[in-house]
């Protein structure tokens, strides 16, 4: 799947993206996750979508040449799982949403901003890269701990979390 043989049928449905993106994440291939999401979901946005569709916007599977049958399908929402975990780097460290790791992977991006819903409220993270410096702003509800952890995409960079330099 990560290195498909020539002639292999490509993923044709957003339903399979969950498994594909999961495999990429396990292999530490965050940049490819972002590329796959952009490749397969950007065409929906280009058509004015505000939800995720049942099928990718390739070809004409619906009537009147419109590229889908249904405009809202939970099975198509894999990016909602992976973007906070990979690009924002927010992952749980303790049961009940009481502690989270913040370890954003840059994935070839210059900035990212978002939040992860938790039982106590949102964990929000934004980051911006400027040259060799990465500024991360993170916040969590009262009683929720955040722990920063470096990853390979941050190696050699001057990282600041909420204005404090990180080693």
List each model region and its residues.
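Non-catalytic C-terminal accessory modules of carbohydrate-active enzymes
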Residues: 31-167
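Solvent-exposed loop and edge beta-strand segments that line ligand/cofactor-binding
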Residues: 1-17, 63-75
